[in-house]
């Protein structure tokens, strides 16, 4: 099977699982915004925001090492899984130790043990599901994802609509669904069988920790870029403002979801390709069409966002639509940064990954600290946008030191300017549809050749 077909096949498999999963999550937002106040929704999201940070710290990001070393072929995969589970046990102990300290944060003190159980279950989830990829069980991976989300949605309906449990119901839904799917993946994914024949290798343990440990700072930096603004909005503005900001961030998540579907397949493909060949044309083509897709999707979503949000969210969250356009542009540059992050992973340049993300995180913290006290939610939006732009451009430049990925700079910059101006105009409610039409026409004219190639390839694929 050619590498393009293999990449497409893996992407489609992950798409089945991810689209089903994310569609359910997307449809749950109206439920949350109608059965929870903006303050409750903000509190719940704050807990999950902190959980993301703790997962990276307590796990030493070992789940990334599981897939990297499991796919490399130089190690026995069951031994790789054993290292993952050893780290998981340590994370349980360390997590229980620091949870009372985390509970000193007043907003989440009531929910600290809910946070703990969600974090440890999420670490196990990431280890198990990455290992399913190592085993080539991508179909099971997709099916289990859909099942977990379906259970989460069902629990949410029960706890929020029938029991009116608010934040408690929201947290219980995620904890119970993650716990059940962890057990299912362990049994039906036959991970128990893999562990039964595993042997501890000290050298492998050290190598995996050496690979994953620098990723802690990288992931923490990503957390700062992606989520620290939520904590700062809660502290500097209000929990209700955080709820509105969270609702606004759900729409850009659609682009992030689509990219993550591709990214899961791309991570596997680039690791395999980097160890056998280093043809820049392949990487350049993939990047070109990834940017074409994400920027095009951004234009479409920004155009319809005002009308869509009117029907999508509860009335208490009505102002959220204004923040979405610039967050959508942020999602485009996040996709660019993630693409180059995969190249770092394949090249085992985790230190570069860490430092480029750390730079953007520092930029984000400074801008948030300066702007949020005066501009509220807008300060967080601007900080997020600038941080993603910084990390995207820095990585594009840095990766060229190790491999050549051809990028048409004129086209890339032109499209970037178009989507940025379009987003600003829509956020300001300035001649939305006239500006949108001009932006789309400019986008099509710039990408006419590449769009034509895509149409021809798609037509051939359909006619087969």
PLM region spans:
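N-terminal membrane topogenesis motif
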Residues: 1-24, 67, 75, 139, ...
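Interhelical loop/hinge segments that connect adjacent transmembrane helices in multipass membrane
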Residues: 1-3, 113, 139, 163, ...
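Signature of the first transmembrane helix
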Residues: 3-63, 92-96, 118, 149-153, ...
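Transmembrane helical elements of multi-pass membrane transporters/channels
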Residues: 10-25, 148, 170-185, 189, ...
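Alpha-helical transmembrane segments of multi-pass membrane transport and lipid-handling proteins
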Residues: 19, 56-59, 82-109, 113-114, ...
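Helix-loop junctions and terminal segments of transmembrane helices
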Residues: 58-74, 248, 252-288, 341-346
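Hydrophobic alpha-helical transmembrane segments
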Residues: 144-191, 358-363, 377-398, 438-443
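Membrane-proximal transmembrane or re-entrant/amphipathic helices at the cytosolic face
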Residues: 405, 424-464
């Amino acid at each position: 099977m050619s590498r393009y077909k293999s990449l497409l096949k893996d992407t489609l498999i992950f798409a089945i699982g991810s689209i089903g999963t994310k569609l359910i999550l997307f449809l749950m937002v109206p439920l949350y915004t109608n059965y929870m106040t903006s303050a409750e929704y903000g509190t719940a999201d704050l807990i999950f925001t902190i959980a993301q940070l703790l997962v990276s710290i307590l796990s030493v990001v070992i789940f990334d090492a599981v897939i990297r070393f499991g796919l490399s072929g130089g190690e026995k995969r069951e031994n790789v899984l054993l290292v993952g589970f050893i780290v998981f046990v340590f994370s349980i102990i360390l997590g229980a130790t620091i949870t009372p300290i985390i509970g000193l944060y007043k907003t989440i003190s009531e929910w600290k043990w809910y946070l703990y159980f969600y974090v440890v279950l999420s670490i196990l989830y990431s280890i198990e599901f990455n290992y399913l990829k190592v085993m080539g069980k991508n179909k099971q991976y997709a099916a289990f994802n859909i099942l977990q989300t379906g259970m989460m949605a069902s629990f949410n309906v029960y706890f929020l609509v029938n029991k009116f449990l608010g934040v408690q119901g929201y947290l219980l839904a995620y904890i119970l669904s993650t716990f059940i799917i962890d057990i299912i993946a362990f049994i039906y994914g036959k991970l128990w069988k893999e562990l039964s024949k595993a042997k501890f290798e000290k050298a492998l343990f050290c190598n995996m920790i050496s690979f994953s440990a620098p990723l802690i700072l990288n992931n923490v930096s990503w957390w700062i870029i992606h989520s620290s603004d939520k904590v700062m909005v809660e502290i500097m503005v209000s929990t209700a403002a955080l709820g509105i900001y969270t609702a606004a961030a759900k729409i850009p998540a659609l682009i992030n979801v689509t990219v993550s579907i591709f990214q899961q397949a791309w991570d596997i493909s680039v690791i395999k390709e980097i160890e056998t060949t280093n043809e820049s044309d392949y990487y350049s083509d993939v990047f070109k069409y990834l940017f074409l897709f994400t920027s095009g999707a951004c234009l479409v979503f920004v155009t319809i966002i005002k009308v869509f949000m009117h029907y999508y969210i509860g009335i208490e969250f009505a102002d959220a639509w204004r923040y979405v356009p610039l967050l959508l542009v942020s999602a485009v540059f996040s996709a660019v940064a993630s693409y180059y992050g995969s190249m770092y992973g394949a090249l085992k340049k985790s230190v570069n990954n860490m430092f480029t993300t750390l730079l953007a995180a520092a930029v984000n913290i400074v801008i948030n600290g300066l702007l949020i006290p005066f501009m509220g939610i807008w300060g967080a939006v601007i900080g997020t946008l600038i941080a993603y732009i910084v990390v995207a451009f820095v990585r594009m430049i840095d990766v060229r030191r190790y491999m050549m990925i051809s990028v048409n700079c004129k086209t890339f910059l032109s499209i970037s300017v178009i989507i940025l101006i379009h987003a600003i105009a829509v956020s300001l409610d300035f001649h939305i549809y006239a500006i949108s039409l001009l932006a789309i026409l400019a986008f099509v004219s710039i990408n006419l050749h590449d769009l034509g190639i895509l149409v021809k390839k798609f037509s051939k694929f359909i006619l087969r």
